[in-house]
Amino acid sequence: MSVRPQNDFDGKAFAAQLSTAPGVYRMYAGDDTLLYVGKAGALRKRVGSYFNGTPKNARLTSMLSQVARMDVTVTRSEAEALLLENQLIKSLSPRYNVSLRDDKSYPYVLLTREQWPRIALHRGPRAVQGRYFGPYTGVTGVRETLSLMHKLFKLRSCEDSVFRNRSRPCLQYQIGRCSGPCVDLVAAPDYAESVRRATMFLEGKSDQLGEEIMHSMQQASEALEFERAARLRDLLSSLRSMQNRQYVDGRAADLDVLACATQSSQACVLLLSFRDGRNLGTRSFFPKTNGEDSADEILGAFVSQYYAEHSPPREILLDREIPEAELIEAALSTAAEHKVALKWNVRGERAGYLLLATRNAQLTLVTELTSQSAQHARSEALRELLGLAEPVKRVECFDISHTMGEATVASCVVFDASGPVRGQYRRFNISGITPGDDYAAMRQAIERRFRRAVEENGVIPDVLLIDGGAGQLAQAQAALADLGVENVLLVGVAKGEERRAGHEALIMADGRELRPGAASPALQFIQQVRDEAHRFAITGHRGRRQKARMTSKLEDIPGIGPRRRASLLKHFGGLVGLKAAGEAEIARVEGVNAALAARIYANLHGLALPDAAGEASPQ
């Protein structure tokens, strides 16, 4: 239900006509900006509490002074209200709620759900059907897990496009890291059994898995199936070896440890994870707060929101008691379909884990605040150097990368006073220009970036850095003028003498040059932004160039048309398989004779190409 008042919002009257059922309430400002999302065991009582008496702190006073209307959603239980509250906070990011930064970049192990499941590293939205295990503290942890999984269970890692088109096993099969389901070298029931065991391992049930494998090995031995018994023995040996390397403490088999540190209106929540006795490392989160949230409120919000997106372990240690712990515990247990216990008064080893997490949270927050302080100082120095009246809130920098005109890519990176805003980085694949024309590439990138901003009333930077001299700066100026973009300070960043860092010249739109010197905090900030733009452009360029070269390898060979190219790639399961084949193997592909096979082999290995005379027409 919703009420939009004609005049000032009457919170008491609104609360009086609400149900006493549990639910979620939302507060909106006059311009429909969402201010706050909350949950209630009894809507009438909870909403009414905001408007009875004086707000208990400045944050509430500020928030309530802006409320123009409220919405409520009735739920069946308070636990259901808690889940809905977390979903809304995650998707809508209300101004006054404690909210987590997006964690889509954290890596997971993905086990796909299909006839022949694939196991692989995964980042980003969960668009692929399957089970996601994690998140891990970094890519290294995922790769170590995947390497172990391939050795133990021999599950495929190839993409479906490669899997469907192979005609012979790949290198992974040859080195004993895949069972070869692509060419029917493993029976479906056996592969399914490997998937089941891999799932048990990822669920932290390696002890149970070891007992099961030992039992199967004994059965195989009794049945005189000695080859199968030997395979199971090797599997068990590898599993035991892994457990001995990674075992930490059997009593911390499946456990998360959370600690919250606060300082200067900022907070850090540190997560230390153990799975099957293995220390998976730590991750730090910096929730958005309003300066007056207490550490227990911040930690409580973190627990609710984080485990709404990630599978909780059976035991979660907290460095302090959190509000509504019993309710959160019940909601997590219901969602996870197993008992989840929240604990804060612990002894022995677990107290040691909490102490470790607490110290790390405090150190991480101090490091973050120090970094932010230095970043703010550099941003302020930039404002003074450029003569701006207002603080610099947003800086963008463009750079161009290519190899002799090939695969040209432009990058746009974004910084604010706190540092890089990586979620707003953009790359532009440049096309339709003379190869190697950096001026045209810069103009195209600027036009594409700011045309969208003009059409959609998007955000415009305070300062726009152009990596290059007067020529690139002039192109950016012309592009912005054509689009009618104003109030952007353009600065060209030209290489210094002998291209030495610290000797850069800053070229202003009016032709002035500034040379702040290597000791200038403002120049250090510009160098940081410029170097990040350079890195981001090069990474994009290399990826585009590699993709183009892989695609064009066969296209450049006389006698290879679309049909033959498709036949070759299908026969060998891709360019990698084709490159590993000899001339005789290539010549067995339908439509490829010995002469053409020799040309293909020579092209792929950088050898002198045989004469193409007498070849059939491309197909």
Curated annotation (Swiss-Prot):
Its main location: cytoplasm. One of its GO terms (molecular function) is DNA binding. It comes from the Bacteria. Residues 207-242 form the UVR domain. Keywords: Cytoplasm, DNA damage, DNA excision, DNA repair, Excision nuclease, SOS response. It is found in: Cytoplasm. One of its GO terms (biological process) is SOS response. One of its GO terms (cellular component) is cytoplasm. It holds the Pfam family GIY-YIG. The keyword Signal does not apply. Residues 20-98 form the GIY-YIG domain. HAMAP family: UvrC. Belongs to the UvrC family. The UvrABC repair system catalyzes the recognition and processing of DNA lesions. UvrC both incises the 5' and 3' sides of the lesion. The N-terminal half is responsible for the 3' incision and the C-terminal half is responsible for the 5' incision. Interacts with UvrB in an incision complex. This is UvrABC system protein C. It comes from Xanthomonas axonopodis pv. citri (strain 306). The gene is uvrC.
